[in-house]
């Protein structure tokens, strides 16, 4: 029996690694996918072999993550419940893809992961595996074997698995960092400063603002301060710059896939900055009809990805919409990073429906007036009529005194 | 011929006041509605009589504005295009109501206002008047008589109407301040510090944060830092406090009713703070189903009000929804005001779907695991199936090796 | 141990009734709620006692069903996936309410029902019970004890429970009849004539049409052919009349709550006729803004009720919208019933936004022309601009040859 | 001065043709685009020259209309306000395209058409011309010169233009026929039989039904009764077959672009049949998530096309969604045409999410039961909690009597 295990090097997956050998007599192949978490991957590999892995894979998927996953999220202004940039949610399908690749290559019929039965990640892992490799068995030991933290701690000690005493549960990738547990579970209490690593406090942020200019092509960031660069590089740089100014902290009440509400805290300096800039550029370059409809498309996209429905055909259809719409989203946006704020202070674009409009605006100024009259009349006709009827008021004056008066003026 | 004129005391309406007497021989009754603009109303009255008004009305509608208009906007999280709290838009129907009251009382058949033919306010004024008093004639001299700024200036000089040299066009009420014109028309340029009056710059904001706690009942703010107060008072206080911390500046590209895109700059310290707090409390107290649907209801409400469709029956229907939903929105939210940021750092409520959930969460922890399994399976069934079919992969294994193995473990 | 059982008198619930006594030693109280199914309720009572019920309740809830459930469905134009009038789905929460009433009165801590684990009704029963009586245990023997049809048949024979040989599984109430099973499970095969009881085939329908006129007040049917009557009576009559003309057969692919697609066949003569009439009257009396938004509200309402979320706060909020909107839905609609067709051929209303419009239409005819010009210009401005920009075409002609020419004509 | 005129050969456009020569001294080039209207095109050409056209174009665009316009409408299930298949609305942008082609080829700077200022077509013509040829002047003589019917009649008589005495105003193309005017303007009166030409009355329809089977590929009809054919041919045949059975009459209240409600009557046998079949096949082949969202996309598409916003970027974005979604819409649908009814009685597809489901359904039958339990619990968790809290009921029983009892049974 061969099992592929998504291995982070932490307590849960180390215990599982050991346990699956012990209880199932399985050969376990460990896989660590690098999506930008700040880990020591050599140490993780060491651990994997130490705890009995027959083979270990380290897969650097950072660039793939930026190009094929984060890129789509930016175009979709992806903020689940208007707040969470989906960092963890976005990385899960990529990790699943890698696990399945290894499982197929290694002839393993079982894929295991360390998710509990209470969170969102089990939904993302399990549905991803079912989609990509329906013939695989999914093994979710924490849930299926009802492993409790206490039991795990004891088991770990027995088997020489190092047990950290950290209070918070962290997940990280280039698109953001999520912090759970401890005092954060009480939504009435302000998150203590110690939970943050990527962002400084407003107090410690520089007194002077810093301006960054982001260039977009087809809705995708392609340059920073005039310098062309790959999305991965741009995100890494922006995480640093914006984080230094305290930008990107998020604290809100979130509805998990499984129906539970929970208080969630994130840091996502690049994500917050880029999505603000992107949304602003859309307002300049997209028609009001596209903006209005795209906001529905965008939230549905976020909802699907958050809830593990990455492989649902609806995602591709939504992207069919988004890719077409984004063709006009070209230009540059300047963001001022200052004391926790990311403020868009300037934007320009060859596709601006604004600049051109300004030109024609002047041209219109002589006859625009009559245009508006007709517009208002027809635009509001039904509403006015309905209100009048409901309140029993009716227009009676066909011949108005003013018309005559105005004529004399003309 | 009697005309009721919405009179601000500024250049446009002073010119119109004079002009309507001169050209139409009209008796003009001026009306100034106080919705919180920081004007000298005695001086305005003086001016009105000086330029020939036969009668002047000053109407203090601040409390009515807070209770019947702003209140609804808070419950609807009203932000047009996710940015503009509708300050001016909200006040227009109230002003119209007052104009109509005066027109009826004074037997005037004509209502005049100073809007141009290019903006949003003409839509709001004209549709409001048509709804409330369809028998009235609407006179919009700037548009109908094609008055240009230059012509107005000259006319003003001739008639002793004072001409200010201010660059920006301002509209103010308790819910916000809008600034237009001058360099702001170029969306690529950062708004100069001089345009702001209600908010200090981040630089000048205090180094220490200030916490405010807002209490809500049925979605409406009812207390500040534990002290019960009327909405009007609460807003006025919060404008001051939040403004002092540089909170509430808005700068975005906006789609006007008439189809033009324009760059708009606002200050709205209380509005920004209260809507953030309100949205956060909704996440704690409303089910995910209500939150998701209400976001559609909310944006439609904002769209209607922005576009002058206050009297459209749809607004009342949307409020039917909102009022029912808001019954659960009770509790307190703590906001940290600091260097331009308004950060929600704590929330509590007897209606929290979170706290109770935490309790039951624990209870569930023993059997939740199987619940999630069934949930994931059925929740993702169609998506997985569709993906498998499309990619020609099919689940084949009915009898799995793992099931047997697991049994031995149990 | 006392159990309240939802008892239909059929095989499943009779087996359960017996089994719960035998296996659990329970005292079982049977409840049959009459929502218009064409059953012999005395016989059902006899059976209940025969198979060991300690007490039997027959509850006539037909009028309550019409007034408090069907009434809301009509106002919401309730058609799940544009097809199914929700007959069964609507009745479930009412039945649950009655079960809970009995359970509380009789001091029973357990409520049992005969649903399988594959359908929609288990969702509706279980969520309803959890909402109304969370302290109650829910017993769903077919699912929990894995009862198969074969096992049930054998058990029934052993215990003298009559076993019918009917192929189809039927559920009926005043709002419709659903037919499942047998050949209907193959969606490529036309439903055989034998499955229908409430509607004649088109062949056997009368050669001559029949006109019915339905009067509505606030969106609710209140009269038939000019005669005022209660909704229950109106529905019963209309089921007969429309059914006689072959109106009301439905055959479509439906997405069940649990994720399965299934082919469903229904008969609902009154429902189909009334909803058509109601929708038509809405088009006459509601503004286009309300119609457009209400269609979203309506489908969400249907979705909630279909999926057993009757007690979800969102339903009440949607009804807040609907009740407000329906205030204008007054008038009469004439429907022609003929050979399977229900065709709206006439409608009138004092609230018509049409008749009044016709009047003003004439008035407008002299100057409407310029109104439309301005409307079109502003309505289409952004779209035209965006298209021009994208295709590199720009308007260049400011002074047109035609303008001069036209002037000479004027 | 050269003018290109959209010429139908009817009274309006013949009068305009003459008038533009007379009043403007213009050279007029007439263009008749054949989109399937049942006209004598040779006679129209004769007339054009007789009334002074310097050149006449007859352009057969039927196939282009089917392939590039109707095709998209089918994929979008296009029914404006759930009723109107957009026949006229769809043809307008194609006609505009042809007019612009001719104008450019012939060096004409003006494009003229015969629309009044009250209807929808002016919006479609004018916005189309502005998009495709912004440098062109648009001449809309009926509106701009305020031509009344009486004046036109007199003018026609004077200039030998034949005046018909038909009561109804007709517009026709392969996708449908619209009938306006006369008694139809009273929405309370049933349309008289004489207005229909493409469909027989139910009375005269055959006593026996006729089955047609329509094959779809990527959402587009490609075969009729097993025979592959081009969409144009398929539509023409189906218009005949379905029309013969009285299928395709539409009568509803419609909201025009300009805000007026009007009663509209259409015949569209192929459109009604194909859209029904297409929608049914979608239910079989698309996931519930896609179906739900696509219904929003579809109505927005119809809304845009109805309102003349064919060139709005949003249309292309919506089609990006639709084209992706429709990849799964392959298969065959059988429709029974009978006495005015078009009833889908069978459907099959290799992409069916139903047939496969049936297979797996069986597989699930042993453990599905527990899956549903978990699903229901989590699916309804928040709703139940919210209801309980609101009504002050709380679950208290942690240890239930039944659990013990059930255990003894297992």
From Swiss-Prot, chains A, B, C, D:
Pathways involved: Amino-acid biosynthesis; L-arginine biosynthesis; L-arginine from L-ornithine and carbamoyl phosphate: step 2/3
Domain of life: Archaea
EC number: 6.3.4.5
Matches recorded under InterPro entries: Arginosuc_syn_C, Arginosuc_syn_N, Arginosuc_synth, Arginosuc_synth_CS, Arginosuc_synth_type_1_subfam, AS_cat/multimer_dom_body, Rossmann-like_a/b/a_fold
One MF annotation (Gene Ontology) recorded for this entry: argininosuccinate synthase activity
Binding site for L-citrulline: 84, 120, 124, 169, 178, 254, 266
GO terms under biological process: argininosuccinate metabolic process; L-arginine biosynthetic process; urea cycle
Keyword Nucleotide-binding: yes
Pfam families documented for this protein: Arginosuc_syn_C, Arginosuc_synth
Residue numbers binding ATP: 6-14, 114
Localisation: Cytoplasm
Binding positions for L-aspartate per the UniProt entry: 116, 120-121
GO cellular component: cytoplasm
Catalytic reactions of this protein: L-citrulline + L-aspartate + ATP = 2-(N(omega)-L-arginino)succinate + AMP + diphosphate + H(+)
Keywords recorded for this protein, A-Z: Amino-acid biosynthesis, Arginine biosynthesis, ATP-binding, Cytoplasm, Ligase, Nucleotide-binding
Keyword Lipid metabolism appears in the UniProt entry: no
NCBIfam families, alphabetized: argG (TIGR00032), PRK00509.1 (NF001770), PRK13820.1 (NF010392)
Subunit architecture: Homotetramer.
Similarity-based family: Belongs to the argininosuccinate synthase family. Type 1 subfamily.
Entry-linked HAMAP family: Arg_succ_synth_type1 (MF_00005)
Name of the protein: Argininosuccinate synthase
Organism this protein belongs to: Pyrococcus furiosus (strain ATCC 43587 / DSM 3638 / JCM 8422 / Vc1)
